[in-house]
């Protein structure tokens, strides 16, 4: 007799994760771990120190509230899974570092959580790796962060070409529509964020934006920069050129895109994102000089966040090969359990990874089979007898 469909559906829902979340199995987890470690090493090499904001934040009434996953805690307080690490860092800095002057260099590798419509199929958990330079101002700070942005992607193995990184300027973009009412300007910018330049300009025209201003905005947004504020365009180009000085002679990268408008609303100056033809947007960042002031004393700041899963997809689209692991020795116990334990300890002390018995999920890791002879020697599958130190040299070669 078959299992009723309703019972099958209930059973399936019990073993599947909630909508928008997924299980990461060992092979992928290892690959993601390699990417995370590479990024963390790049952050540290530029003086950034890791920190860990809490998983929960106070639910807010900001424009991104609709994307927060909220619930009431046992105290009756409305809290949310953190939707954005930059905002969490801004709150932390305003509170914990309010009396500290000077520049802070902070980094993180952690997930954020954002609500997605049920029918969209979007992920509600996003693993991010990023940095925040708090207190750094001016062209040099912008260039350093933009250069680190590119360096992080390249250090993971991504081929960064001219079109991979796009650079814009929020001050220029909002200035193009400064004559509009704030609510209308928000509608126009919303259309631009969706990539609908024609729709944004049409809404500006309907709102009475003068024809000359419309022509100027059209030229700026469609790549004809000769009729826009030269100082703003020069700021974008100067930042890109200065960032490229980190690797003199390297291939050119960085395309000015005056229509670039990130999803998050707090950016105030230079903005940038990395786009891959197969994975879409894999990283973004920019200057946000007003965000920390929403929690306390204002401080200039700039940073970026990399979507680690999207970067992973982009790397595999380019036939990325993660570095090989050292093999795992599967040690078959002898009748003497004490000798087995001592042998395993000697092998580990020599630098060999050892598991007693078998391992069902190996995540692509190479294995060596061996039988225990005594507390320091094993017999390999080919019949050779090896002592722990000698085997360690062989495995490590």
Task: Describe each model-derived feature in a short phrase.
Residues 53-55, 164-169, 358:
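Acidic carboxylate-rich catalytic motifs and surrounding loops in phosphoryl-/glycosyl-chemistry enzymes
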Residues 167-180:
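Short, conserved secondary-structure transition motifs
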Residues 69-76, 180-203, 278:
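Acidic, His- and aromatic-enriched active-site or binding-groove loops in soluble protein domains
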Residues 2-87, 143:
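TRNA-binding/sensing appendages of the translation machinery
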């Amino acid at each position: 007799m078959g299992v009723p469909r309703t019972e099958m559906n209930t059973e399936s829902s019990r073993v599947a994760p909630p909508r928008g979340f997924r299980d990461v199995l060992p092979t992928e987890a290892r690959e993601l771990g390699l990417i995370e470690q590479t990024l963390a090493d790049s952050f540290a090499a530029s003086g950034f120190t890791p920190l860990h904001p809490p998983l929960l934040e106070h639910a807010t009434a900001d424009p991104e509230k609709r994307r927060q996953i909220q619930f009431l805690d046992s105290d009756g307080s409305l809290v949310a899974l953190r939707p954005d690490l930059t905002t969490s860092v801004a709150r932390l800095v305003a509170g914990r570092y309010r009396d500290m002057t000077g520049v802070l260099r902070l980094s993180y590798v952690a997930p954020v959580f954002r609500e997605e419509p049920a029918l969209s199929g979007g992920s509600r958990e996003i693993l991010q790796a990023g940095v925040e330079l708090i207190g750094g101002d001016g062209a040099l700070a912008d260039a350093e962060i933009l250069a680190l942005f590119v360096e992080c992607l390249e250090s993971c193995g991504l081929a960064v070409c001219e079109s991979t990184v796009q650079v814009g300027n929020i001050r220029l973009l909002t200035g193009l529509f400064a004559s509009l009412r704030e609510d209308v300007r928000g509608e126009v910018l919303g259309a631009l964020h969706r990539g609908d330049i024609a729709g944004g300009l049409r809404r500006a025209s309907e709102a009475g934006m003068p024809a000359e201003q419309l022509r100027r905005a059209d030229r700026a947004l469609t790549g004809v920069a000769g009729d826009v504020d030269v100082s703003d365009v020069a700021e974008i180009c100067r930042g890109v050129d200065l960032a490229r000085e980190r690797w003199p002679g390297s291939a050119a990268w960085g395309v000015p895109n005056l229509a670039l408008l990130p999803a998050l609303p707090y950016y105030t100056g230079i903005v940038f994102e990395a786009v891959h033809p197969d994975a879409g947007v894999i990283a973004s960042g920019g200057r946000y000089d007003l965000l920390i002031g929403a929690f306390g004393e204002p401080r200039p700041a700039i940073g970026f966040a990399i979507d680690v899963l999207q970067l992973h997809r982009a790397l595999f689209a380019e036939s990325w090969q993660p570095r090989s692991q050292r093999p795992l020795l599967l040690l078959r116990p002898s009748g003497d359990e004490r000798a087995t334990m001592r042998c395993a300890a000697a092998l580990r002390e020599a630098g060999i990874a050892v598991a007693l018995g078998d391992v069902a999920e190996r995540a692509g890791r190479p294995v060596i089979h061996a039988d225990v002879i005594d507390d320091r020697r094993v017999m390999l599958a080919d019949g050779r007898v090896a002592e722990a130190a000698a085997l360690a040299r062989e495995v490590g070669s």
